C-alpha cells in the first residue's frame, strides 16, 4: 500500500507552512487562504484550515534506511526529539525491522521519521527534506478498533500488517510502504501521554493496483 495524498486540519496555515518548510524542509506545492500542500516524497501532504479545533494527528515519514542517525542529527538541530524510553530517543521496532524517532510539529501533531530495513531504499545523498520518501503511516482513532478494521477490510480489501499481530485496541493495516494505525479513542499516542482523539482526515492511497479514498469525518 502507498499513501498518495494525506489531508489534515490545522488551526494555523501560516505557522504550519513555516514549520514544514523551515524545520522539515518540505517544498510548498500550493497554497490558498484556507489550505497549504507540501511534497513529502511521492505523498502530497495538505493541511486545511480549522478554527479553534486544536486537531492532533500521529503520522510517519519514511526516510532512507541508511539515514536514520543522519536524519536524527539534522532534525535535532531544529527541534526537540522526544524520549521513547528515557533517556533513549530512538525506538527499535524489532518485529517490524524498523527504527524511528519522534518530534512535535507546531500544531502538537506527533511526527515520526522511520527507517524500514526490509525495504531497499538506501540513499547516498546528504539528508535533507528532499530525502523524505513518503508519508507511510497515519493514525485513525475510533471507539471500536475491531469494527473499523473489519469495515476497511470489507470495503477496501485492507489486511492486517503481517509484522503486527492484532490487539483489541490496536490494529495495523497495510504493508511496509503504507500503514493505517487503528487505535482506540483516549489511548496514549506513543511515545507520549497525549490522548488519541479523532479529527477529520482524508487519505488517497493505492493498494493492489487500485487507487482509493478514505474520509474520516471525526
Predicted regions mapped to residue ranges:
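Basic, Lys/Arg-rich alpha-helical nucleic-acid-recognition elements, primarily the DNA-binding modules
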Residues: 1-51, 55, 62-64, 71
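N-terminal beta-strand motif that seeds the catalytic metal site of vicinal oxygen chelate
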Residues: 1-14, 118-151, 155-159
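Short acidic/polar mixed-charge low-complexity motifs
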Residues: 43-44, 109, 178-179
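Vicinal oxygen chelate
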Residues: 13, 61-106, 140-218
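A short, sequence-level motif marking secondary-structure junctions
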Residues: 49-54, 117-119, 185-190, 218
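Short, structured interface segments
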Residues: 103-125
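Conserved catalytic-core motifs of GNAT/GCN5-like acyltransferases
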Residues: 27-32, 115-116, 159-164
Amino acid at each position: 500500500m502507498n499513501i498518495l495524498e494525506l489531508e489534515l486540519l490545522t488551526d494555523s496555515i501560516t505557522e504550519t507552512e513555516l514549520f514544514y518548510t523551515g524545520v522539515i524542509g518540505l517544498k510548498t506545492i500550493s497554497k490558498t487562504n484556507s489550505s497549504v500542500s507540501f511534497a513529502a516524497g511521492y505523498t502530497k501532504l495538505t493541511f486545511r484550515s480549522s478554527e479553534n479545533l486544536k486537531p492532533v494527528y500521529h503520522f510517519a515519514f519514511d526516510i532512507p534506511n541508511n539515514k536514520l542517525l543522519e536524519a536524527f542529527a539534522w532534525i535535532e538541530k531544529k527541534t526537540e526529539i522526544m524520549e521513547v524510553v528515557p533517556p533513549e530517543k530512538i525506538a527499535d521496532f524489532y518485529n517490524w525491522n524498523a527504527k524511528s524517532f519522534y518530534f512535535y510539529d507546531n500544531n502538537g501533531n506527533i511526527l515520526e521519521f522511520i527507517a524500514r530495513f526490509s525495504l531497499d531504499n538506501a540513499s547516498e545523498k546528504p539528508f535533507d527534506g528532499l530525502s523524505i520518501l513518503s508519508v507511510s503511516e497515519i493514525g485513525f482513532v475510533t471507539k471500536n478498533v475491531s469494527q473499523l478494521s473489519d469495515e476497511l477490510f470489507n470495503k477496501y480489501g485492507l489486511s492486517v500488517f503481517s509484522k503486527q499481530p492484532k490487539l483489541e485496541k490496536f490494529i495495523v493495516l497495510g504493508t511496509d510502504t503504507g500503514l493505517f494505525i487503528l487505535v482506540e479513542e483516549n489511548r496514549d499516542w506513543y511515545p507520549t501521554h497525549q490522548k488519541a482523539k479523532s479529527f477529520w482526515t482524508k487519505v488517497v492511497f493505492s493498494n493492489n493496483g487500485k487507487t482509493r479514498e478514505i474520509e474520516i469525518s471525526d
